Amino acid sequence: VAFDVPFPPDYGGVMDVYYRCRSLKNAGYHIILHCFEYGRGRMHDFSAIADEVYYYTRSKSLLSWFSKTPFIVATRNSTALLKRLLQDKHPIVFEGQHCTFWLHHPELSQRKKMVRLHNIEWQYYEGLSKRSNSFFKRWYFQSEARKLKRHEETLNYATALATISASDTDYYTSRFENVVYVPVGFEQFPPKLRVKSHDPFYLFQGNLSVEENSEAVHWLLEAFRKQSIPQTLIIAGKNPDQVLVTACSQQTNVQLIANPSDLRMQELMQTATAHLIIGFQHSGIKLKLLNALMTGKKCIVTPEIVAGSGLDHLCTVISTPEELAQNLLSENSLSEQESATQLAEVRELFSEKRLLEVVRKYLFDD
């Protein structure tokens, strides 16, 4: 049961859903995919990851804002979903706390149910409230954080909780039984493209309409300007607002590529001198970090990006604009041997083998 339509797999949460479904289908499982759709469309070919696909609309009732149930849960309360789940006896995977509205329903009490936890939701929303400049958004994030923390008790109805990072595993293990760490599994790595050589550039990529990413871009722009960093910075991603577009246009060594195609983004990631993965809020594991590491390129990150991930030794960790400038001015990219070592370790850490073991043990073994 997915909180969003997992296509295209172009942001963290849906990437995890998409590649996990593909791994399970390739392993011989029959996948019935239930998606809450609210803007990503319903005309997708999911034959590579699912055998059956059903779509549901998120509730838009004003009552959801004032419910004791978290908004992200209350708006995914489809009775059509419950009816379909009751048509068989198959195990169920609920994606995130978002999709747990029916987790404790009495008619599902005998089913094997796993909740895939993409982060500690209440902490994520609490962090958003501290960083937002909007009064309404701060109120909403604070309210949602309180509701999500209370709502965690519903997770006791799950057969197993599958966490995405080591630090999240520690948190949930202290509160629940049957918590198991299941890293993101990428068995098939992106193929190398034949691309023309580029002048050296540093890449920041992400969904630019997300406040956290927009904040990171503005931090980078200020760092490049104040530290007089001469190298080229490319900002690539979806739906930048006009403020960000204007800010990028005011610096001659900064190029903004809005809404690049998947192929163009892949080309940028494989030809960048290094990836700049900047963020100021820890949550789960940043899948764009894994994507960057899989290119075999150097990754320069802030501490929050790698906190609890066990990946800090594969990255260059910086905390200040001065440290960023020092690293960029040295222009030391990874050697071929360092790149090969990085790729080998990422493949080992994020193999799909762990996923298949956990699914078999918790959802199918008696």
Which residue stretches match the model-derived regions?
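Short hydrophobic beta-strand element within catalytic cores of glycosyltransferases
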Residues: 288-294, 298-302
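Active-site proximal beta-strand in glycosyltransferases
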Residues: 91-92, 108-131
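Acidic donor-binding loop of glycosyltransferase active sites
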Residues: 269-284, 295-297
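Conserved catalytic-core segment of nucleotide-activated headgroup transferases in glycan assembly
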Residues: 16, 181-250, 255-270
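A charged, aromatic-enriched C-terminal amphipathic alpha-helix characteristic of glycosyltransferases
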Residues: 76, 333-365
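N-terminal subdomain of nucleotide-sugar transferases
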Residues: 1-52, 87, 225-226, 298
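Membrane-proximal helix-turn-helix segments that form the acceptor-binding/catalytic region
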Residues: 79-86, 121-124, 132-161
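Donor nucleotide-sugar binding/catalytic pocket of nucleotide-sugar-dependent glycosyltransferases
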Residues: 51, 114, 141-191
